[in-house]
UniProtKB/Swiss-Prot annotation:
It is found in: Host membrane. Keywords: Host membrane, Membrane, Transmembrane, Transmembrane helix. This is Putative transmembrane protein ORF25. It is a multi-pass membrane protein. One of its GO terms (cellular component) is membrane. It comes from His1 virus (isolate Australia/Victoria) (His1V).
Length: 93
């Protein structure tokens, strides 16, 4: 049952207090990708710091869960760019 509460908490905004830990995890993983791929992706997460600061004052469950989703999508896209699966103009040929 604890797992269900964790999942529901994401959509209720209960896990939003851990967004800083989530951001640090994404930065660390991005740094590791940059280390092994030669792509310095760690600096691109600086824009999320201000976004997170603004988002922390808003208590809307849809906004809180969307923050996690957006950050995860950006991390995945940057990972694909780091490994050169996709380029800045789309899928590499």
């Amino acid at each position: 049952m604890a797992g269900i509460h964790v999942v529901l908490g994401l959509f209720e905004g209960a896990l939003f207090t851990n967004v800083n830990a989530f951001l640090v995890l994404m930065i660390i993983l991005s740094g590791l990708i940059g280390l092994f791929s030669g792509y310095a992706s760690i600096g691109a997460f600086g824009s999320f710091v201000s976004f997170t600061h603004i988002a922390s004052t808003v208590d809307l469950w849809i906004f809180n869960s969307m923050l996690y989703i957006i950050m995860t999508i950006v991390f995945v896209v940057m990972s694909l760019q780091a490994w050169q699966f996709i380029g800045s103009n789309g899928v590499n040929q």
